[in-house]
Amino acid sequence: MPDFSMRQLLEAGVHFGHQTHRWNPKMAPFIYGERNNIHILDLSQTVPLLNSALKVVSDTVARGGRVLFVGTKRQASDIIADAANRSAQYYVNARWLGGMMTNWKTISNSIQRLRKLDELLAGEAQGFTKKERLNLEREREKLDRTLGGIKDMGSVPDLMFIIDTNKEAIAIQEAKRLGIPVVAVIDSNCDPDQIDYPIPGNDDAARAIALYCDLIARAALDGIARQQGAMGIDVGAQVEAPVEPALQAPAEGA
């Protein structure tokens, strides 16, 4: 499991919430105090909750599950994609299309179209005029921006990790409807009740977002390593299993 320190959280500005007048009163239990009209989040609660979130990510991946990273705000977009790619997971970082999870069949059709365009444009796109090729490239670019990060996901994910629960409210609603657990950073203006595995922290500062995403990615990689280790043990057990009865048979007959 990835390690982190209280100092790292402080240096990344994880403890800085929003202006006090913008708060969600449901966040009161996670607020340490206020300074210059800014809420300060209680990092002594963030540490164990972040550890719990990292464990659920690792455990999900270890049993073959998929994690979907969601963060479409400007300062999260690139970080989200990088973390998901680095940990062999999936992401939505441009725009959440309504029904992305609850209407997976329609989304799958769009993904098939994206794959088809990839194939067409990978070759010389023979038989197309310059204008036709340009139109195909534009269509592909548009589809890739919204669906490129989930193109290989295969079906809905087993866990979602979200930056900015207010901005990604539709994604959270869809996860709830499908029973997909949600790990999310909750700032002082968020509703923690919607989140299965909340991480109290700043969801605006790029350094804080980069820290969460790096830790979640490393937890996923930890899960992959555990899954591969378990598979190795299983394979070994399967190889040995047929030998045991054969060795025991003569003893039973004797």
From Swiss-Prot:
Keywords: Ribonucleoprotein, Ribosomal protein. Gene3D superfamilies: Glucose-6-phosphate isomerase like protein, domain 1 (3.40.50.10490), Helix hairpin bin (1.10.287.610). GO terms for cellular component: cytosolic small ribosomal subunit. Pfam families: Ribosomal_S2. GO terms for molecular function: structural constituent of ribosome. One of its GO terms (biological process) is translation. HAMAP family: Ribosomal_uS2_B. Belongs to the universal ribosomal protein uS2 family. PANTHER family: 30S RIBOSOMAL PROTEIN S2 PROKARYOTIC AND ORGANELLAR, SMALL RIBOSOMAL SUBUNIT PROTEIN US2M. This is Small ribosomal subunit protein uS2. It comes from Brucella ovis (strain ATCC 25840 / 63/290 / NCTC 10512). The lineage of its organism: Bacteria, Pseudomonadati, Pseudomonadota, Alphaproteobacteria, Hyphomicrobiales.
